[in-house]
Amino acid sequence: PPCPRSVKIELTARCNFNCSFCAPGYKLRDKRDMDWGFYRRLLKELKHQGVEEIGVFYLGESFLLPWLPEAIKAAKDEGFDYVFLTTNGSLCTPEKVDACMVAGLDSLKFSLNYADEEQFASVAQVKRGLFGDMVRNVKAARRIRDQGGYDCGLYGSYIRYDGQQGERMR
């Protein structure tokens, strides 16, 4: 069968949240990062097979990786026209976002699955204060993109959470 046009690569299996709606099997996996050499080899093979777009995320939080900007640049250098990323937003500081945009990130999506700080603390199962960090980081990303003149789409996604998703997924 032909290779898909777009592929997501999970650079890390680590996440700083513990969301109740996240895939239950995720919590059973080793929380490790992908080997850099393996990542580079994977990029070459995917490009050779005709993949056009690379997502540098899956279930883990890619902003935990110190080499995320280098991973984005490596994908662009390999010839991928579109490199995208989804984040929970809590760790994408202005400095990290700027580095990713400089590296060539084409799309940054924020997974904003919480209506307010209370729901955030309950669903993500982390400190309430991270909600404010997340909101500030979303606003900063737009400012950085606009001031730097970067061609990076900024998006948000939201799952309407009724409190039962976690139970239904078990």
Regions found by a protein language model. Give the residues of each.
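Active-site loop signature of alpha/beta-hydrolase-fold enzymes
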Residues: 17, 115-117
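Short, electropositive alpha-helical surface patch
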Residues: 72-75, 112, 161-170
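Histidine-centered beta-alpha loop that forms part of the nucleotide-sugar donor binding/catalytic region
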Residues: 58, 87-89, 112-115, 159-161
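Internal catalytic or translocation cores that form aromatic/hydrophobic pockets or channels
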Residues: 107-110, 117, 156
